[in-house]
Amino acid sequence: MSTDFVFSRLLDKQSEPIQLTAPVAVSELPTPALVLERSILQRNIESMRDFLAAEGKGFRPHSKTHKCPVIAKLQMEAGAVGVCATKLSEAVALISSGLTEILITSPIVSKSKLEILNKVLP
């Protein structure tokens, strides 16, 4: 499988938030779907930031928890020093959404994955 094909497949998986204006039945949601109350999410991000700041610590949340570049951007806007990604595919999604401070927490050992990484790095 060529790295160009794999790379294009990774970029095809991008998503944007959809603001629901009316309730939607769970059975009608496209899956997978991350459904949350944005104000509560923002409050939780700020609480984490404030708790760690009170201890003199910064934070670098792991995107594996939410797998969502939009949430990673909110965390960065709240003061995170960066975000972590377990796999290259997670890092590619974050990079292609405009994030730059990404720590890949697993080793990249194959030549094809290194080629993909080189294509997405600025």
Which role does the model predict for each range below?
Residues H62-P122:
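Active-site-proximal beta-alpha core segment in soluble small-molecule metabolic enzymes
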Residues S8-D12, F59-R60, I104-P107:
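Short linear motifs at secondary-structure transitions and domain/linker junctions
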Residues A33-I40, S63, V109:
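Catalytic cores of large soluble enzymes that bind and process phosphate-bearing ligands
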